[in-house]
Amino acid sequence: MAGIVLTWLERGLIAGIFGAVLILIGTVAAEGLLRVRGTAPEPIRQTATVSVARAAWLISGVLWFALLARLVVHTLTVFPFPEGLSIDALLTVGLRSRWGGRWQVLLVLVTALLACAWHAARRPRAATAFARDGIIVLLTLALPRLGHANGDAWRLAAMTAHLLAGGVWLGALAVYVIGRDARAQPLLLQGQVWHRFAWLAIPAAAVVVLSGVVALLRIVETPSALWPSTYGALLLCKGVAVAALGLCGWRNWRSGPEHGLGVPRLELALAVTVVLLTAWLTDTAHP
C-alpha cells in the first residue's frame, strides 16, 4: 500500500514539475508577445510585463519546492521508511546516484532561476529578464534527461522540442487564463496580442505532434507492441486529449478573446490532463 502511495506521489510531483516548466516557458512567450510594438498601449504592456515577471517568480518557487519534495519521495522508493528520511539516505540518492546527478543540475538551475526571477519581478530590467529566460531554456533542455529521453540523442532532441513547443502553446495559454481570472491587467487578452498568440500557438501545436511522433518511434521498437501495454493505453489517452486540445485551440482562434473564457478554461483543463498523462508515461516502462 505504501509503495502505491509513493508511486502516485512521485507521478504527481513529476506532473507538477512538468506543468511548472510549461508555464515558465509560457511566461517567456507571453512576455515576448508583449514586447512587440503595437500589441497594446504602453501602460498596459508595462503592467502586464510586471505581472508576467511575478508569475515567473512564483512558479519558480513552486518548482524549487517540488524538486525537493521529489528527492524525498524518490528516496523513500529506494530506502524503507523511516530510513528513507535520514540525511544519509537523502545524500546517497541526491548526491551519489546517477538519478541524483541529473536532479542536482535541475536544482542548481531552478535556484538560479528563482534568484533571477525574484530580481526581475522587483526591478524589471532587460538584462535580468534575458538572464531569467535563458535559464528557463537551459532548464527545458535539462528536464527530459530525467525520463525516457535520456541516452538517445534523437529522442532527447524530440522530447526537448516537445516540451518547448508545449510551453509556447499551453504555458502561454495558462498565463492568459490565470491572468484573466485574477482580473489583472490584460496579458494575452488584447486583440493584437491574442491574434499573435494564435499564430504562435498553431506552429507550436504542430511541433508538439511531430516531435511526439518522432520520440515515440525512438522509444518503441515496433508500434504493434503498444496495443496490449499500459504504455500504449496511456499514449492513446494522451493522443485523444491532444486532439481535443487542438479542436479547442481552433475554436479559440475562430472566436477570439471577446467570447469569454469558457473554451480557454476547457483547453487548460485538457492541458492539465495531458501533463498528468505525460507524467504517468514518464514513470511507465515502455514495450
Enumerate the predicted regions with their spans.
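Polytopic transmembrane helical bundles with strong interfacial aromatic enrichment
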Residues: 1-287
